[in-house]
């Protein structure tokens, strides 16, 4: 590209100003003689400004190229571009909306408040932090545990927060006064997960002591202990109707339990490593290829319940493992219908998208992945979503956002769109 005379004059003036302001007096004098120009105050600092502008533009170009590449990959994989998606099936997009910093150790759990623009994070630093996820502002710290806080959960009203810890306790917090109102004792080892039942009058917990416990929230009493896993029970979740539980363990299995009877109904054994996480499907999930639900006869059988046991509206269970895979299981038959392969390291957390079409996963490969359930494959990947392993994920039920937490001690808020 050839410069005009005016552009050459401006460039020479900017170079002369740079030599002079940087202390290169001899060079400045010689340059003045050769170009026959004088210092112009209007050109002061121009070369540095142009240089930094080029760097900023280069970064913008690289970001746009990465975005185009990601969209091309998504479309080539059979995904739908953002313009063709409605609000109800919007997917997480880059860049992140907020980066929340303040914890002094790994983030173990993140949980959105069911009503307000608030999110709570739990950390290895033995604290929980409360944030406004719309503004990204830090609000307060909850202290009380004496070891790593492993998990947190809200009841449906959002008035109660439950937390569990490596200090062997579960704590209940009044989320209006932020006071700890009860401490539950009973587990003999690290308490790794806690979940409220839909009614809010009970909660369940899982532990490294290999057990699952059921607690009354009003009294803090343990009313039931479920045993059967042969190693650390990593996670326990509750079905939407509150009749069944699902758990996963270091023993490489996932189990489904009848809550009222305390009986194990199903055991899934096809993972080859620790099962880290699991999720019940929503009632509006799309049809999974090969499912019993693909025929009218199968639907009737599933509704009646396999082996005389009904699983309510949850037709499927998803599990994520350290074997780097995610599996989709049919509850009515106990069959594995799909195995998702794509993560390059442990799968740490999974959530079904509220629209029922997708599963979102995060893992130690630092990526967020979106899986199309009908196609059985990954349609979107956000690589390097964190600078270290991603340990947890949550969906906001009332605002189109997800949150991720990592071993990099930070929480990220991602807008869906």
From Swiss-Prot:
The question of whether Transcription is a record keyword is answered with no
**UniProt WD repeat ranges:** 102-143, 144-185, 186-225, 228-267, 270-339, 342-383, 385-417
Region annotated Disordered, chain positions = 72-93
InterPro entries cross-referenced by the UniProt entry: Dynein_regulator_LIS1 (IPR017252), G-protein_beta_WD-40_rep (IPR020472), LIS1_N (IPR037190), LisH (IPR006594), PAC1-like_LisH-like_dom (IPR056795), WD40/YVTN_repeat-like_dom_sf (IPR015943), WD40_repeat_CS (IPR019775), WD40_repeat_dom_sf (IPR036322)
Instruction: Please indicate if the UniProt record lists Transcription regulation as a keyword.
Output: no
Parts forming coiled coils: 52-80
Instruction: Supply the alphabetized keyword list.
Output: Cell cycle, Cell division, Coiled coil, Cytoplasm, Cytoskeleton, Microtubule, Mitosis, Repeat, Transport, WD repeat
BP-aspect Gene Ontology terms: cell division; establishment of mitotic spindle orientation; microtubule sliding
- Domain LisH spans what residues? 7-39
Q: Which SMART domains match?
A: LisH, WD40
Gene3D superfamilies with a match to the protein in the record: 1.20.960.30, YVTN repeat-like/Quinoprotein amine dehydrogenase
What does the entry list under GO cellular component?
A: centrosome; cytoplasm; microtubule; microtubule associated complex
- Gene Ontology terms, MF aspect: dynein complex binding
Pfam families, per the entry? LisH_PAC1 (PF24951), WD40 (PF00400)
- Which cell locations does it reside in? Cytoplasm, Cytoskeleton; Cytoplasm, Cytoskeleton, Microtubule organizing center, Centrosome
Q: Which SUPFAM superfamilies would you find in this protein's record?
A: Lissencephaly-1 protein (Lis-1, PAF-AH alpha) N-terminal domain, WD40 repeat-like
Q: Which family does it belong to?
A: Belongs to the WD repeat LIS1/nudF family.
The record's comment about this protein's domains reads: Dimerization mediated by the LisH domain may be required to activate dynein.
Checking HAMAP family in the record gives: lis1
| Function of the molecule | Positively regulates the activity of the minus-end directed microtubule motor protein dynein. May enhance dynein-mediated microtubule sliding by targeting dynein to the microtubule plus end. Required for several dynein- and microtubule-dependent processes.
Name listed for the protein in its UniProt record: Lissencephaly-1 homolog
